[in-house]
Amino acid sequence: LSVASYFFDDDGVLAKDTQIIKDGILVAGLSDLASATQLGTVPTGNGRRESCRRKAYARMTNTFFEKGTDKLEDMIASIKHGYMLFETSNGMEDPKNWAIQCVAQYGIEIVDGKLTDNYVSPVVMSGYVPDLLKSISMISDDFEISGAGSCGKGYKEWVRVSDGGPALKARVKLG
């Protein structure tokens, strides 16, 4: 459990784990009671609102990738040139066009499989979600959850969330 955990969502639906992707296939989305009814699916228990004066929206809670089997050192060693990114925040998605953007507070350059002393900050990542997910080639065996985030919708509609998981080796557009 984390600061974003709850037993019932704000629609009164029992909270449960929702596996979004399984074996590389999108198997479920997050829903609140209204969206599940409209789509003819079972609600996932993700209807959350900032306060009783606000509308419930489908929101993330504790969102993460499950750990893999790769050692972080092996992942770094496999990279000819790239960046290891840290402290991601400010994620934003476009559900209609499958675009994503988020910010890492800093990155460390990797050259010939070794971390360098070259730091960059901040780092903006962007891309097309299916391409990003398909590009994941390694997943570390470590796992860490951070509970200090929030998910925003509409005008000043914030709820607490956690995210994290293992390190991922993927191709993303940096700016």
Where are these regions (language model features)?
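N-terminal small-residue-enriched
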Residues: 1-175
